[in-house]
Design a protein with these regions (language model features):
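General beta-strand recognition
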Residues: 39, 47-49, 80, 92
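Short, surface-exposed beta-strand/strand-loop-strand elements in extracellular ectodomains
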Residues: 41-59
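Short beta-strand-to-coil "C-cap" segments at the C-terminal boundary of structured domains/repeats
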Residues: 51-52, 94-97
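Edge beta-strands of jelly-roll/beta-sandwich modules across compartments, strongly enriched
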Residues: 87-95
């Protein structure tokens, strides 16, 4: 089987951030990305929302436990996140080239 995955290059304009995900919405810092792409990895069920001053709720996009995803993203925005239910864990956010 051949691996056709393209390697991910971290965008030097934004230092990757790791945050604790809990039962209250929290935000990343402002994310600068030249490619318009961000990579998000979570260790717990987490809901996420993008925007200039977002607040995440349990109605927003759900990322399941131990999931990694790449999203199109508007440079200059932030990512809000909140845990799903009583669990807690971490979210890692990286801008990619």
């Amino acid at each position: 089987m051949t691996n056709t995955t393209t390697p991910t290059t971290i965008d030097n304009d934004f230092a990757p951030e790791t945050h604790t995900v809990g039962n209250a919405s929290a935000q990343s810092s402002v994310i600068t990305t030249g490619s318009g792409l961000v990579r998000i990895a979570v260790t717990t069920h987490a809901h996420i929302k993008f925007g200039s001053n977002p607040t995440a709720t349990e109605e927003d996009l759900l990322m399941p436990t131990d999931h990694v995803e790449v999203f199109r993203f508007k440079s200059g925005d932030k990512i809000a996140f909140i845990g799903h239910g009583a669990g807690s864990g971490e979210i890692n956010i990286s801008a990619i080239d």
